[in-house]
């Protein structure tokens, strides 16, 4: 990136002149957070430069400055106006990626021979990851499709390794992958199969880049058992808040629309509540039923209901809380319901809030101050077009669409803080209820009170790419200084990077200069413009004057992505139709597509990827911290995310935290509400005449008057009037009317209707599809836009599809298009509503809703449920289940079907419908999930801890896991055993480091003799070493490190003066050299060699002297020149065990210099080994804890602290935490520090925490008389501890699972990195197995078997008791004219809770051919003693569904309803009716019962053997007596595929039951043997439904020819039963004497021939 300049050559020449007399000022500007592996810009300037200046920029590691991480060069000269930039890129090394503390680098710019150096914070953020799932919600067993978009900081695609984890709602990872996007162009496409047995709730996909694991991006999806709704509901309050003084309450509009756009008719149940933090208070009295007509309804929360529902019932107690509203909308047909909720409607005293979040906190005296006032509604949304005014100055403005108003205030030439109060000025709001807010702005501090200022201002407009922004530079300086200012340098920061650098020149005398800035897509979503000028002020000081401004840009893509219609415009499309999509995108872009059913977003719209979400993530990563300006020039740079350093000492503060400083939060002021008198609710005045009239009305339940009066709520006067009239007036009979009914399908079907076989059912109903990535867009046009036309076939759903697109391009980055909607519908269709799952053998009702959207045409329709042997229903293999109905124009009819699922699994339910006299039809085939009976049980079989080191034998742990006890398992169901393995990550207990700030006293200037200099140098060396090791310079002061290193260099140089010719050291040159002091110099210099340049030759010569001059043959070191300053030698001062302690001390010093001197001193290794042998031999005799500790460290360095030496060392410790001598605090700190180093050398991390804790508790921070050794050793040991101790214990487990049903063992390796990952193996076999574990660390083995267990006892309904019966109506009942008969339906229900159930619903489906008596329903729902609140039937159509609303259901007595139902046409088989009761409050609390005139409980007939059932509703077999049957007929039929057996039998016994008949037969001849290994003369049981009794007419003692199919064999061998069904042949075989009769002769001959043929020849193949 090169800086831009003004066009004038003259200005350039002027700029190249020296700005003022004196030295030029060199400046370096970088972002104050540099990102690893990312290109960053460094701005370099020479103000007042001359000639050509060579500049190099080098980035070093911090603090050591040993590595060059990046190096770039440039020139500053008159051609570039002495302004240039370089681009640096810092590689991600292991040290920089460490998660211990914040990491920094040192950036050094060298201008000729002038160095400018700055320490800069680095960020490990590699870029962004955005995750898109194909849907927001999934069912168990389905597949999550997802894409991960890998982009850098500019949102451009990047190829990197990404780790992706899927986590359960409990945060347990179950899948972890690493994927590279290197050749994927930034788009990773992945999938995950959700198990059938899975935790419901919100799951997470988490992703991070390999080189920045601490920066995790995530997306959520929900797992739930659900069925997509057919419509959506929105709740829109008339205002986005509730104004506490509003007497009219809160109005909420309910909008309900089908997903294909048509309006919904139905009923909404609405309840309001108050949210107080996490607590919800439900306002039970607000529960109302709202009719939804043409898609709209309105619910009102009355003010009094709101006040009465909370404690205390005062308006001021509600302020600050919010209102929520829940609505459940039920379709008129009762076939579908949708719940919706709106939360966070704030209760407020003022409808608006004022914020100053977009206003700078600093102003320039006597210059305009731009106040950006942000006004919001109480829900946080922008408040548009609200007038605002400042108090005092009375400046007015109006908020724009984004809620922001700009108010420019002229400030006075004072340096006092500026207090500004802003208030709204909205009409119709009392003065006391207007919003007000006060802020204080502080004056910008100029250097040395020079009063030189710069003010940047921008107009308040919504900026879009392509527009030009005029930035005004306002200058205010002393007129004499103005001529010195020739230019402003400006920088633009965007997305944490320097986007643009340039100069804006000014002519003399110009107070205002305008920079026209062209906005490009790179400026999205916002940017900061920082500008400054520099001059030498009147006092001769170099000064920098700066300002900044934050500018918002309209959030949109940086590029282009549009999905639209590429074919002819159509309002609606038909299912399965081909449509053309046109995709417009940037050149070279790759576009990821998905089409999602809008019903998915009705259930969950939280987790969609949008462009807004992308910008939110990017804005959060902004390194700037304020809306602009700053406390002074340095504050302007820092707050904008920049760091500045100049050669003349002007610089910004050090940034040490990636997060912006958070302002302290203020507590809300208590709001005093004006006391107001509350409106009282009006009293209900009873109408006594109405009470009397109602008493005279007919009551279908025939209750006595006293019982009826109990339902009256209107008071005693009304009860008296009601009873008086009820008891003396005869009942009025009212005529029944009929508006239409189901008609029976005629057998002589008309020709003008499409046959069922020709109707192709719709069967493709995916919730999402079109999951594809497009790469082959056409060549770009002149605007750089590429297009693609895609032809796709729509799926079969009647809905609206949202087509979502996300693109990624190399130049324009990531872009999320606005969703493109495709609506699919037809004017006649079936909506088949199936539950998520049904239970095998349990009768259920499903509904097919037939819609007619024709404008003015009623449709006569034949509808049919197709036969499927997996279900028992009125559709059988022999008889179709057809009905004819009429659907009025723009209406719908619900057709209920009762079915019994017979088999577990996924089975198809298919309904077809055709319209008479039109070529219009529709069919729907959907899959229904049938689950086993009983309850799903998760049985924990075993939970074992895996810890082979402690629980195993020889390092191997074996666990035998038994099979689960499944004695209560439902027959014919599977079990699944899950074997779960998880590592147990055990954290290593670590102690905190000593706070670096406490070490400031240790940084000191060394001086004095050879001993005093070391006493002065020691604390600084060890303090710098400790702060380096614990990453604490940011606390201590990053700039102090350089100063400390200078002091170490000084001490080093001074110490060399005391080096004798022999290379040994003493206090003075003339004194004999000291062994201890020389060894100590080696120790300190060896450590300092990591910090400053130390001459290794000098150091190693000193080492040689120690070995050659002072070590005896037995390894001991001797002292011949004791030190003068005995206080510096610490515990060595004690004369006991001196040989051992000196030898250990020197050995340690030599070992610490080993890395530097090993190559130069050949004898170093031997010398250390000899000294070690000496210590080893004398260790057992030691008595002093000090000597035990120092010698232990020396031995541990050589790996010799083992066995009894280790035992002695550990036993010497007091309380296992210190090596202590009486009354010797400093010696004890020193000795315990040596002991800690010994433990660390042995990697014994479990023993170290108490030792470190003891050292920390001494609160010893070094310094003071006699502290040299204690200071050095305590900080050396604690630094080593922080460096060495791992943050966790080792975990490396190998686990193998040996399942008998598998050939080989399943193996898993558990490492620390993946410890929390839940590994699982599944098996369908319930068997005993073995688990074997080896290795280090801990894990957990859990074994869970999931199966369906039988329910104990009959399951009652949830929370409701329900009885339903139907009986013939008395002869006296008056029938409607065209009714064939009448019956009375009795429904009794009782709530099983602790109190009455409010707002309950009876959903009743009628038996085929029946309709309810409308007058009865009117009577029940009107009058003061009404039993039902309201009833609803399908408008203008067949009354085959009825919904009754009850205000309450008693929990003490049964509430009963009775009403007549009339039969309008006869049908061969009457399908049972169903009654369901449920409470609005809890839709799961349901109870369902069936009814039928002939079947008790209204249940379809099933044949059951043990726990397995089959349908018996099919027609009986054809009894072969009617027509003559030939020999050929018998042979053909008996040899049909599927026929299993052919027997001659004799009936010996009949058992006639209520439902089924059993016939015991003896097998007399096996004509064709089948699956049953039956022998002649054995008995077998034949079973038939009672409906077939008359058709069969079997006689005891008679013989029969019987054959049947294998599917009619029942039970297990040897006790097999035979079902007599539609495929069974039963033919009377005449007795021998009957064969003599002429009429039987032919049959007897044929039967004999048939038997012979079958036995001799069998069936032809």
From Swiss-Prot:
Domain NTR: 1516-1659
GO cellular component annotations of the record: cell surface; extracellular space; protein-containing complex
Paired cysteines (S-S): 557-815, 625-660, 691-718, 692-725, 705-726, 872-1511, 1100-1157, 1357-1487, 1388-1456, 1504-1509, 1516-1588, 1535-1659, 1635-1644
Residues recorded as bearing Phosphoserine in the entry: 38, 70, 670, 967, 1320, 1571
Top-level taxon of origin: Eukaryota
Domain Anaphylatoxin-like, first and last residues per copy: 691-726
UniProt function note: Precursor of non-enzymatic components of the classical, alternative, lectin and GZMK complement pathways, which consist in a cascade of proteins that leads to phagocytosis and breakdown of pathogens and signaling that strengthens the adaptive immune system.
Subunit structure: (Microbial infection) Interacts with BHV-1 GLYCOPROTEIN C. In absence of complement activation, the C3 precursor is first processed by the removal of 4 Arg residues, forming two chains, beta and alpha, linked by a disulfide bond.
Protein name: Complement C3
Record organism: Bos taurus (Bovine)
């Amino acid at each position: 990136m090169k800086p831009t300049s003004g066009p004038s050559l003259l200005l350039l020449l002027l700029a190249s002149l020296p700005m003022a007399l004196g030295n030029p000022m060199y400046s370096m500007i970088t972002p104050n957070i540099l990102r690893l592996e990312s290109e960053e810009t460094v701005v370099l300037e020479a103000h007042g430069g001359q000639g050509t200046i060579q500049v190099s920029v080098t980035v070093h590691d911090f603090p050591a400055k040993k590595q060059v991480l990046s190096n770039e060069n440039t020139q500053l000269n008159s051609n570039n106006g002495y302004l240039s930039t370089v681009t640096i890129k810092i590689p991600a090394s292991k040290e920089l990626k460490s998660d211990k503390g914040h990491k920094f680098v040192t950036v050094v710019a060298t201008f000729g021979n002038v160095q400018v150096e700055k320490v800069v914070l680095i960020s490990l953020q590699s870029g962004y990851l955005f995750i898109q799932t194909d849907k927001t919600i999934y069912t168990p067993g389905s597949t999550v499709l997802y894409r991960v978009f890998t982009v850098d900081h500019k949102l451009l695609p990047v190829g990197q390794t990404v780790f992706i984890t899927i986590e359960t709602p409990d945060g347990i990872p179950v899948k972890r992958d690493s994927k590279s996007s290197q050749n994927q162009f930034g788009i990773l496409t992945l999938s995950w199969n959700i198990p059938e047995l899975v935790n419901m709730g919100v799951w997470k996909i988490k992703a991070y880049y390999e080189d920045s694991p601490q920066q995790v991006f995530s997306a959520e999806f929900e797992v739930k058992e659900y069925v997509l709704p057919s419509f959506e509901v929105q709740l829109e309050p008339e205002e986005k808040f509730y104004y506490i003084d509003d007497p009219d309450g809160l109005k909420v509009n309910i909008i309900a629309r089908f997903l294909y756009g048509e309006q919904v008719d139905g009923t909404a149940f609405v309840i309001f509540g108050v949210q107080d933090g996490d607590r919800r208070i439900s306002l039970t009295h607000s529960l109302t039923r709202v009719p939804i007509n043409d898609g709209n309804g309105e619910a009102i929360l009355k003010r009094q209901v709101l006040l009465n529902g909370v404690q205390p019932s005062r308006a001021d107690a509600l302020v600050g809380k919010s209102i929520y509203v829940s609505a459940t909308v039920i379709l008129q047909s009762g076939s579908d319901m949708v719940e919706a909720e709106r939360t966070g409607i704030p209760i407020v005293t003022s409808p608006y809030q004022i914020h100053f979040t977009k206003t700078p906190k600093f102003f320039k005296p006597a210059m305009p101050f731009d106040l950006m006032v942000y006004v919001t509604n109480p829900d946080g949304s922008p408040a548009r077009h609200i007038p605002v005014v400042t108090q005092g100055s009375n400046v007015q403005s109006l908020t724009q669409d984004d809620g922001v108003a700009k108010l420019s205030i002229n400030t006075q030439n004072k340096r006092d803080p500026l207090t500004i109060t802003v208030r709204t000025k909205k009409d119709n709001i009392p003065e006391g209820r207007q919003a007000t807010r006060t802020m204080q702005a502080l004056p910008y501090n100029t250097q040395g009170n020079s009063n030189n200022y710069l003010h940047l201002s921008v107009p308040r407009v919504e900026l879009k790419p392509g527009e030009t922004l005029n930035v005004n530079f306002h200058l205010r300086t002393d007129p004499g200084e103005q001529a010195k200012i020739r230019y402003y340098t400006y920088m633009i920061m965007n997305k944490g990077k320097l986007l643009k650098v340039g100069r804006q020149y000014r002519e003399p005398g110009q107070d205002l200069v305008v920079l026209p800035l062209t906005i490009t897509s790179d400026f999205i979503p916002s940017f900061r413009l920082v500008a400054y000028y520099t001059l030498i002020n009147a006092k001769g000081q170099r000064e920098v004057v700066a300002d900044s401004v934050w500018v918002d840009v309209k959030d949109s893509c940086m590029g282009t992505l549009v999905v639209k219609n590429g074919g002819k415009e159509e309002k609606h499309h038909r299912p399965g139709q081909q449509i053309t999509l046109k995709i417009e995108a940037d050149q070279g872009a790759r576009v990821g597509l998905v089409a999602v059913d809008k019903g998915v977003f009705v259930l969950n719209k939280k987790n969609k990827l949008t462009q807004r979400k992308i910008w939110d993530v990017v804005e959060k990563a902004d390194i700037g911290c304020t809306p602009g300006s700053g406390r002074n020039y340095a504050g302007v740079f820092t707050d904008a995310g920049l760091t500045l350093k100049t050669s003349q000492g002007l610089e910004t503060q050090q940034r040490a935290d990636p997060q912006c400083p958070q302002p302290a939060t203020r507590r809300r002021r208590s709001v005093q509400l004006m006391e107001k008198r509350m409106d009282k609710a009006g009293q209900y005045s009873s109408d006594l005449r109405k009470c009397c009239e109602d008493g005279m009305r007919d009551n279908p339940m025939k209750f006595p008057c006293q019982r009826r009066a109990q339902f009256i709520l209107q008071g005693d006067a009304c009860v008296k009037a009601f009873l008086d009239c009820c008891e003396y007036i005869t009942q009025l009979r009212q005529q029944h009317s009929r508006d239409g009914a189901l008609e029976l399908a005629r057998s002589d079907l008309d020709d003008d209707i499409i046959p069922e076989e020709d109707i192709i059912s719709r069967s493709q109903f995916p919730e999402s599809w079109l999951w594809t990535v497009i790469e082959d867009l056409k060549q770009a046009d002149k605007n750089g836009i590429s297009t693609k036309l895609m032809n796709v076939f729509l799926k079969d759903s009647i809905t609206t599809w949202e087509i979502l697109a996300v693109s990624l391009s190399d130049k324009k980055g990531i872009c999320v298009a606005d969703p493109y909607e495709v609506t699919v519908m037809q004017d006649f269709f079936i909506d088949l509503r199936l539950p998520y799952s049904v239970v095998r053998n349990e009768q259920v009702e499903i509904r097919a809703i037939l819609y007619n959207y024709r404008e003015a045409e009623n449709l006569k329709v034949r509808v049919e449920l197709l036969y499927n042997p997996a279900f028992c229903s009125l559709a059988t293999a022999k008889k179709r289940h057809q009905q004819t109905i009429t659907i009025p124009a723009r209406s719908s009819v619900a057709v209920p079907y009762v079915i019994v699922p017979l088999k577990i699994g996924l089975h198809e339910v298919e309904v077809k419908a055709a319209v008479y006299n039109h070529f219009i039809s529709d069919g729907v085939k959907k899959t229904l999930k049938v689950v086993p009976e009983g309850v799903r049980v998760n049985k924990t079989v075993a939970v074992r801890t895996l810890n082979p080191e402690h629980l195993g034998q020889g390092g191997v742990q074996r666990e035998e896991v038994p099979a689960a006890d499944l004695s209560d398992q439902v027959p014919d169901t599977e079990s699944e055993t899950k074997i779960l393995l998880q590592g147990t990550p055990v954290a290593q207990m670590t102690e905190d480091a000593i706070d670096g700030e406490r070490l400031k006293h240790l940084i000191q200037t060394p001086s004095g003799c050879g001993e005093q200099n070391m006493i002065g140098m020691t604390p600084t060396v060890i303090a710098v070493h400790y702060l380096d090791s614990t990453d604490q310079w940011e606390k201590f002061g990053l700039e102090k490190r350089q100063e400390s290193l200078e002091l170490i260099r000084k001490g080093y140089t001074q110490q060399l003066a005391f080096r004798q010719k022999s290379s040994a050291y003493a206090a003075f040159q003339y004194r004999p050299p000291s062994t201890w002091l020389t060894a100590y110099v080696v120790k300190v210099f060896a450590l300092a060699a990591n910090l400053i340049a130390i001459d290794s030759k000098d150091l190693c010569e000193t080492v040689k002297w120690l070995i050659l001059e002072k070590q005896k043959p037995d390894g001991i070191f001797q002292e011949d020149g004791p030190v003068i300053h005995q206080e510096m030698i610490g515990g060595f001062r004690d004369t006991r065990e001196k040989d051992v302690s000196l030898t250990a001390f020197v050995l340690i010093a030599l070992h610490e210099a080993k890395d530097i001197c090993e190559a130069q001193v050949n004898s170093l290794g031997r010398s250390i080994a000899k000294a070690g042998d000496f210590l080893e031999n004398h260790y057992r005799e030691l008595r002093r804890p000090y000597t035990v500790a120092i010698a232990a460290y020396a031995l541990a360095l050589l790996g010799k602290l083992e066995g009894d030496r280790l035992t002695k060392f550990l036993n010497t410790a007091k309380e296992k935490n210190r090596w202590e001598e009486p009354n010797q605090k400093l010696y004890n700190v020193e000795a315990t520090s040596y002991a800690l180093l010994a433990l660390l050398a042995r990697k014994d991390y479990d023993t170290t925490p108490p030792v470190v804790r003891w050292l920390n508790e001494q609160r010893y921070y070094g310094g003071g008389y006699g502290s040299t050794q204690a200071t050095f050793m305590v900080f050396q040991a604690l630094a080593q501890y922080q460096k060495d101790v791992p943050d966790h214990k080792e975990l490396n487990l190998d686990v193998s699972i040996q399942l008998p049903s598998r050939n080989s063992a399943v193996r898993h390796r558990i490492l620390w990195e993946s410890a929390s990952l839940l590994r699982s193996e599944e098996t369908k076999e319930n068997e005993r197995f073995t688990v074997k574990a080896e290795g280090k660390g801990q894990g957990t083995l859990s074994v869970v078997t999931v199966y369906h267990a039988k329910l104990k006892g009959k399951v009652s309904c949830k929370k409701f008791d329900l009885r339903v019966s139907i009986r013939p109506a008395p002869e006296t009942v008056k029938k409607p004219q065209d009714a064939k008969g009448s019956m009375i339906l009795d429904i009794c229900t009782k709530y099983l809770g602790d109190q009455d159930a409010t707002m309950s619903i009876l959903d009743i489906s009628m038996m085929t051919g029946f309709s309810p008596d409308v007058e009865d329903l009117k009577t029940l729902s009107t009058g003061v003693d009404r039993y039902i609140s309201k009833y609803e039937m399908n408008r203008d159509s067949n009354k085959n569904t009825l919904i009754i609303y009850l205000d309450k259901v008693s929990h003490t007595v049964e509430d009963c309803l009775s009403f007549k139902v009339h039969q309008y046409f006869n049908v061969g088989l009457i399908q049972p009716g169903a009654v369901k009761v449920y409470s609005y409050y809890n839709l799961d609390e349901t109870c369902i019962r069936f009814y039928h005139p002939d079947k008790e409980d209204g249940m379809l007939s099933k044949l059951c053997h043990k726990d397995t059932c089959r349908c018996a509703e099919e027609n009986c077999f054809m009894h072969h007596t009617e027509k003559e049957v030939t020999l050929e007929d018998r042979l053909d039929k008996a040899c049909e595929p599927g026929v299993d057996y052919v027997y001659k039998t004799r009936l010996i016994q009949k058992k006639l039951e209520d439902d089924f008949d059993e016939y015991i037969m003896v097998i007399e001849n096996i004509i064709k043997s089948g699956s049953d290994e039956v022998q002649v003369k054995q008995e077998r049981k034949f079973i038939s439904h009672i409906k077939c009794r008359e058709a069969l007419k079997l006689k005891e003692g008679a013989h029969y020819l019987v054959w049947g199919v294998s599917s009619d064999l029942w039970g297990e061998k040897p006790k097999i039963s035979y079902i007599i069904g539609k495929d069974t042949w039963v033919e009377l075989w005449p007795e021998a004497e009957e064969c003599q009769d002429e009429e039987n002769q032919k049959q007897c001959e044929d039967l004999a021939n048939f038997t012979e043929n079958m036995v001799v020849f069998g069936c032809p193949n």
